[in-house]
Amino acid sequence: MDPSAAVEKAMEMAEQGAQIIDLGGESTRPGSDFISEEEEIRRVLPVLEKLPTDQFIISIDTTKTKVAQLALEAGAHLINDVSGGSTELLKAAHTYNAGFILMHSQGKPKSMQEQPSYMNTVTEIGEFFDQKKEQIKELGLPRLWVDPGIGFGKTLTHNLEIMRNIHTFLDETWGVLLGSSRKSWIDHLCDAPDPVKRLGGSIASAIDAVAKGVEIIRVHDVSETVQAIQVAKELATDPENK
């Protein structure tokens, strides 16, 4: 995407209610190919340098330490690490006093959906996060979120188990992030092969997650999701206790 077009899209999303803009130069969806560090920097930095870093929070979505360091120097506020808590990325977050998003995944993007397998999906993901807890506490990061990684080495059954039980990942050490928007689990459940036609499923999962205590919802359709969550929260509120 042209840097100017990417900046325009980011500004549009912020105006619609997005509080965090997640910026990434490399696709990590299942089946995607690896790109070089140099290419990722070439894609990301021109966009980041044009974004107003004082108007919203910017998250750099990367698995590469050098990319994260340059992005944080250019004004990004968070590292979104889909690799599962790289020690070097955690150290970079500590060095730059940045927030961190720790995502669970099973396998590499190219092959993660070939044969994902768990004995107990929710328990194993929870144990994965717990194993990182002491290291994270020692670093003293300003903010931390965990992301169970919907679609990253998971079948439809795994994804549904995670979303039904996402409240079990809540912890005083971190908040929880859910990225379920437009993903293939909606197609597998509702026969919606076109990602753009998955708005209903995306919003339903967002409303459910917020009701269960999830702090961050990663979405594509900002205005629709913001409106839906606002209405759902209002309907769930006892007017006598407002």
Regions found by a protein language model. Give the residues of each.
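Active-site-adjacent loop and "lid" segments of alpha/beta metabolic enzymes
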Residues: 1-9, 28-50, 54-57, 65-66, ...
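Short strand-loop junctions, especially beta-strand C-caps/beta-turns
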Residues: 149-151
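Catalytic domains of carbohydrate-active enzymes, especially glycoside hydrolases
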Residues: 8-24, 212-213
